[in-house]
Amino acid sequence: MYIVVTRSFPPEVGGMQNLMWGLTCSLAKYNLVKVFADFHENYKEHDQKVSFSIDRVAGIKLLRKYRKSYLVNEFIKKNKNVNCVIADHWKSLELIKTTKKKICLIHSKEINHKKGSFANRRILKAFNNIDQVVANSEYTKNLAVEIGIDENKIIVINPGVFPPKEIDKSSIKEAENLLKNKNPRLITVSRFDKRKNHEKVIMALRNLKQIYPNIIYTCIGYGEEEENVKKLTNELELNEQVIFLKNVPQGLKNALVSKSNLFVMPSIIHKTSVEGFGIAYVEAAQYGIPSIGGKDGGASDAIKNNETGIICDGNNLEEIYSSIDLILKNNSYLEM
C-alpha cells in the first residue's frame, strides 16, 4: 500500500493538483492507495467518484499540518501493509515518524532558501529523514544540491500529462468566436504571479501591435497580480488586444490553447519564487503549440530550445519581443 500526503489535490484546480491527481490515479491502477489531503469545499462529490480512499483534513494551516501528520502516523501503526509514503512537499513529511520508505517531490520554490538560514536548516533536517527525492527538472535537482540536499538521494522525473481529450465542438465554436478576426494569437494559462511575467509580455505586445495590428493575447487565470496586469494593459491602450478570462471550463481552455499560435510564459525569478518546470508548456505542446519560456528555472526541461519553442531571458524585454516575432514569422514552429 502507498500513502499519498498532499496539500494540493482536486477538486481544487491547479498544476500541482493535476500532478498529484495523475500520480495517485496511476498508482491506484496497480496498488492500494490511501490519500491524506487538505479539505476543499466541494470535496464530497469529487471523492465519491474515485477508486481509492481519501481522508480530508480541515482547520487552520498550522494545526492542519499537525493533525494530518497524526492521522498518517496512526494509520501506519494500524496498517502493516504500508510500503511507502509519498508527499508533494517536505513539510508534509516533517512530522511523519516511520521507518517506511519516504519519497518527497520537489518543485524548486519551496526549497529555495539561502544556505545556512533557519528555513534552509529546517529543510535539510527534514530531508535527512527522507529516502528518495524526486526533482521535477534538472534545474530543481541542481538547486537542491546547491542548498545541501544529498545528491545521491535525488532523481529527476519531469511531470507528465494525461493524453489530451478530444475537444467538444461547442468549446471549439466558443473559442473561435472569442478569437474571431484576430491573428496572430498568443496565450498564457497560469496564475497572475510576478514570476510568470505577464507584464513583460504586455509591454512586448505594444510593439508587436505595430507589425501585427490584429494580434490578440489571451490570459487565463487568476492571482494577486491580476489587477496590476489589467492596469498596465489599460495604460498601454491594449484593451482591444488582450482578453482576460478566469474560471474557464477545461474544454474551453483546451480549445483556446489549440486555436492559438503561441504559448507565452517567459518566467523569471522573483524573490525565492522560481518556475521549477512548467507543465503548461507541455500541455500546449500536446496541441502542437510552440512556447516561449524563461531561462531562469526549469523551462528548458519542458521546451526544446529552437525546436518546440524558444528559451529567452525573461528580464530582457527586447529578447521577449524578438522571440515572439521570430516564432510568428517562422512556419517551422507553427507547423509543429
Outline where the language-model segments fall.
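Carbohydrate-associated surface elements
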Residues: 139, 160
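Nucleotide-activated donor-binding/catalytic signature segment of Leloir-type glycosyltransferases, i.e.
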Residues: 220, 230-251
